[in-house]
């Protein structure tokens, strides 16, 4: 499966950001996404987490998920692409992501 395909799926990038923030159990990720308005079903979240593990972007240790080095680098690239997009046009970046980037990039 292509990494672009996985990253383009609903909720995937938001899941990576939540794990980066230390929200790392299945339930806490689900609750955090729901609170941010990016709710995904329990089934979809399980699928995304499995896909992210398959792509080696995250790893599971017991009941906790953590970013791998590859996952950290992927988020850096995603942030740079969003900054670039915002620079060249009025981007429609999800609010959850804008909050994670901070005002300095807008």
Swiss-Prot record:
One of the GO biological process terms: regulation of DNA-templated transcription
Every HTH hxlR-type domain range: 1-93
Record bears the keyword DNA-binding: yes
Any one annotated GO CC term: protein-DNA complex
Keywords from the UniProt entry: DNA-binding, Transcription, Transcription regulation
Record-linked Pfam families: HxlR (PF01638)
Protein name per its UniProtKB record: Uncharacterized HTH-type transcriptional regulator MJ0925
């Amino acid at each position: 499966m292509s990494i672009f395909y996985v990253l383009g799926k609903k909720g995937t990038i938001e899941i990576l950001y939540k794990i980066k923030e230390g929200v790392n159990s299945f339930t806490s990720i689900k609750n955090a996404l729901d609170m941010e308005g990016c709710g995904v079903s329990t089934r979809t979240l399980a699928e995304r987490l499995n896909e992210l593990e398959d792509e080696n972007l995250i790893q599971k240790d017991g009941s906790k998920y953590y970013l791998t080095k590859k996952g950290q680098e992927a988020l850096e690239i995603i942030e740079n692409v969003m900054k670039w997009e915002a620079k060249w046009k009025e981007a429609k970046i999800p609010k959850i992501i804008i909050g994670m980037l901070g005002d300095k990039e807008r």
